[in-house]
Amino acid sequence: MNRKIRTWVEISLNDLEHNYREISSRLPDGCQMLGVCKANAYGHGAVRVAQRLQRAGCQWIAVNCYDEAEELRAAGVTMNILLLGPQSANIAVDLASLGVTQAVGSIEYARELNRFLAGTGLRLNAHMKLETGMGRTGFDVHDDSHLDEMLEALSLPHLNFTGVFTHFAVSDENGDPYTQLQFSRFLHAIDRMEQASGHHFAIRHCANSGAVINYPEMHLDMVRPGLLLYGVFPAKETGGLDLRPAMSLYSRVSEVTHHHTGDTISYGRTFTCPHDMRLAVLPVGYADGLLRSLSGKGDVLLHGKRAPQVGRICMDMCMVDVTDIPEVQPGDVATIFGADLSVAEQAEKAGTIPYELLCAMSQRVQRVYID
């Protein structure tokens, strides 16, 4: 590792592919996988992740917005791309020309897309999003009152609805009745639409990471793992999957300092040394993505031993207690999370979820890929 690099993440594309194949091995015949690559592939680097998934045989990926999809197409990613977030309808021609599939969750949005495509000779592939209980976006299917709107969307000449999907609120809880209710609403709505219109949705999908593990009956035609793909479980249930964390965060000790009993550390003087202490300064802070809410709660690994973080995490640095690890010197590498100290543990201590820690890794944290 270049010693000029202060803080970095190592991303194992080999482990990513291992996770893809491990999840794939649990899917029924004919069930496709869509790898969720939004938010720069949860901080892992969307281009490199998508390229590796494509090479491994993945048929679909999902991003949130047009810019994310355009970047992937420019990098040679040719597989199917689903845009989960709504785009401005006035770029409908660009969407169709880019060859992506757009999520459509309201009749107003469907009409606008169709209007901007009128007279172009283009059709935009789309997946209809159904709101079954997440409380966000999608055609409301709590009852049949919006059926006419969904049927109208299916009839629009410039939209080609190849798929239909929904999103679960609590699928990481096994046997949850609310997830069962959402699934029932989803299937009922599809059945009503197909019977009334004669339209057949080629791809039905609803299983996010939690449902991949907990609800195999909900895998249907395609599953949408995000966190699982990167080797992190959304909850304690693993479903027997042998996954490997693809990302590890490291920082190099910049200085070792000595402090006396009663000395205070960092902003706000929230930590007082209970005895003479030896601290290691790590050049990683909340500007890099190390959440300030982890202040005084997390550990790092140095020489295979845990060193507690003390005082408030600063913008560009933090301090850890190495009093009991006398061998620590400037230049030593600290593991902040990885295979031996999970991102899930750090997230729990910070009072958040692994998604936030992974996505928080800023651009100044160099990505080092292991291929």
Regions found by a protein language model. Give the residues of each.
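Active-site anion/phosphate-binding pocket segments in diverse small-molecule metabolic enzymes
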Residues: 2-13, 17, 67-68, 87-89, ...
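Active-site-proximal beta-alpha core segment in soluble small-molecule metabolic enzymes
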Residues: 2-3, 7-10, 17-18, 31-203
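Conserved PLP-enzyme active-site core in the AAT-like
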Residues: 26
